[in-house]
Design a protein with these regions (language model features):
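Catalytic nucleophile-loop/oxyanion-hole region of alpha/beta-hydrolase
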Residues: 61-72
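Conserved acidic catalytic loop of the alpha/beta-hydrolase fold
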Residues: 70-87
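Flexible "cap/lid" loop of the alpha/beta hydrolase fold
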Residues: 97-105, 109-141
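N-terminal cap/lid segment of alpha/beta-hydrolase-fold proteins
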Residues: 1-10
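Conserved alpha/beta-hydrolase catalytic His-Asp/Glu region
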Residues: 123-190
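Conserved alpha/beta-hydrolase "nucleophile elbow" surrounding the catalytic nucleophile
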Residues: 26-28, 87, 91-96
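Conserved HGGG/HGGXW glycine-rich cap/lid loop of the alpha/beta-hydrolase fold
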Residues: 9-60
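Residue in the alpha/beta-hydrolase core beta-strand immediately N-terminal to the catalytic nucleophile
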Residues: 52, 88, 111-114
Length: 191
């Protein structure tokens, strides 16, 4: 388990490979473990980092850290703590929303982004994310596919308040507008 301490709080991450830094950001019910197969493939060419966002996996769980702004600050502080100057980002769901916000606020720190499965508006957010209990969300999002046991165990570490806080913050955002304001090369798959 790799950690860095930011403002006295533990941030958990895992890293594989050598090369240019590539950050993987997980979805609403997940952690770094979600990305293992992709990290293994990417680590041939890149230094692949998978970070547990505030409230997920083994990263600290404090409700005041769960806003999208705090998640963006986590990435910036993480890069500074590790001495990383520029990254590429791959994000899914919540990770895509955090990644998009990070790129718009810090275009000089990101050379490209691949963002998938993020809603362009609140009407595109599945109501289950707001209302379903965590075990139901884990089953829905991870399915029953073989090989999901480790990811399922990690997903159960999610603080449901972290999911709700990010969804509440999204109500004030126009993600389509943010996407249009990006100057960093972007490949996106939206809902």
């Amino acid at each position: 388990m790799s950690i860095v301490t930011l403002d006295g709080e533990i941030i958990h991450y895992e890293v594989l490979g050598r090369g240019r830094p590539l950050f993987f950001l997980h979805g609403w019910v997940g952690s770094w473990r979600y990305w293992i197969p992709t990290m293994q493939a990417a680590s041939i060419t890149y230094r692949a980092y998978a970070i547990d966002l505030w409230g997920f996996g083994d990263t600290a769980k404090r409700a005041e850290r769960y806003t999208l702004d705090q998640q963006v600050k986590l990435l910036d502080s993480f890069m500074e703590a590790l001495g990383i100057a520029k990254i590429a980002i791959v994000g899914h769901g919540l990770g895509a929303v955090v990644g998009l916000n990070f790129v718009v606020k810090n275009p000089q720190l990101v050379d490209r982004a691949l963002l998938t499965g993020f809603p362009l508006g609140n009407s595109a957010v599945n109501a289950r994310l707001r209302s379903a209990p965590l075990p139901e969300l884990v089953d829905w999002l991870l399915g029953k596919a073989p090989g999901t046991d480790a990811a399922r165990a990690e997903a159960n570490k999610t603080d449901p308040q972290a999911v709700r806080a990010s969804l509440n913050d999204m109500e004030a955002l126009n993600l389509l507008d943010l996407t249009m304001r990006m100057t960093t090369p972007l490949k996106a798959s939206c809902q």
